[in-house]
Amino acid sequence: CLWNGFSKTPERDEQFNLSIPYMKNEQIILVKTDSDYQTLEDLAGKTIGVQADSSAESALEAEENKEFKDSLGEIVKIEDYAMAVLEIQNGTIDAISIDEVVARFYLNNDPDAYRILSDSDGNALSLATEDYVIGFRKSDNALKEKVEEALREMSSDGTMKTISEEWFGEDVTTVE
């Protein structure tokens, strides 16, 4: 099965037997804490990093984000988020378009180094919202059902919440 940051899309729904959503995710913008960037408009003419072939890249390419994308100076496609974080630390890029759950992992490990661009109410500025699911072969109904049963048990006994809070600083799970 495919599990790591696997977003639900219509194309994947046709190709795979998808599980129930287990996590909600947003595509957000991560900047260095000491940067002057407060809004998407502040990034006009700046360089933003994005993991190649990711949901973050798709969000930047989406029609609803065209104005923001067109305002940027450059979009740099980076191999993975770990490299993108190094690039922002080094000042090679000004910001990262990134999965919120991945950003929260970095924030949880180094809370003074980064921040998420937020609106005036403190909510993360989101380029897109998505559900994380697990992709199984179309024929793997039995395995899918067992995994979903385990997810529901972990949700009901609080295990998912505990793990989520440990790694992301908050409960981002959606299984009921």
Could you describe each region identified by the protein language model?
Residues 1-42, 124-127:
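Acidic, polar ligand-binding/catalytic clefts
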Residues 1, 15-17, 41-44, 76-105, ...:
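Short helices/loops that flank or line small-molecule/ion binding pockets
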Residues 5-15, 59-63, 94-128:
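A ligand-binding cleft/hinge motif common to bilobed small-molecule-binding domains
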Residues 56-79, 85, 107-112:
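Ligand-binding cleft/hinge of the Venus flytrap
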